[in-house]
Amino acid sequence: VLEAAQTASARATAYQSNTQMAVNQADLQDTQLTALSGLASQLQKAISDALANNDASTLPTQAQSILDQATQILNSTDANGNYLYGGEKDNTPPVTVSTLSQLAGLTSVSDAFDNGTEKKSVQVGSGQSVQIGVLASDVGTNLLQTLKDIAGFDAGPTGNFAGSTTLTSAQNDFLTSELPQAVTTATNLNTATAANGYVYNSLQDAATNQGTLSTLYSGFVSSIQNVDPATAITQLNANQTALQAALQVTAQLGQVSLLNYLPAPTG
């Protein structure tokens, strides 16, 4: 009985540790996805303002600033130096461009990403894994596509936003056609941020319950060692409600995954 109880206690502690790691990553991602969503909203506003004011002279500068910040977010690392949004390629920066001219020169926006395809998962219970990883290409493709479109048009014969005091007909038509994509990008990133927040809250609840589970098992082991098995089992049975609640929350985590909530990139 003692050996089985010690095994169960060690397993519960390990799952609690894994879940807390997942909570920490989801919390960090929440901050960064919120910032990325804000950048998408900035780009949408920059296009809208250019149309409303009949002046896009500052749009290239704003677009480059947004690219700088988005790249910094998507190439961020954890405490161990691993790229958060790189998937299994966590030792390689997932975003490979740093300037609008580089972005405009790509055949496809997908060439701007070098992340892997496997999203990070964490085992939080027996047979229960939760996907918490987010890929740079999943949340960054649409934003970089809009920036690529702007950079490509600006470099073309009818572009040159910075050199125009008022919008030409071609510039107006381009920005008008680009605005819906910018709106969709901002909406999708808001959805991704909310989805990550849901996963974070679910994991946080589970971590609390797993702490209860770990404490119960540790107490059970201590009781066996210091009292007798019969008394220990009686004490454990008295805590069945808390034990069942902790196990139920852990089991429900198998239904939680960012994959179920993130909109697919359209680029």
Model-predicted segments: where are they?
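Amphipathic alpha-helical polymerization modules
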Residues: 1-90, 162-267
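Polar, low-complexity export/assembly segments characteristic of proteins
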Residues: 2, 74, 78-188
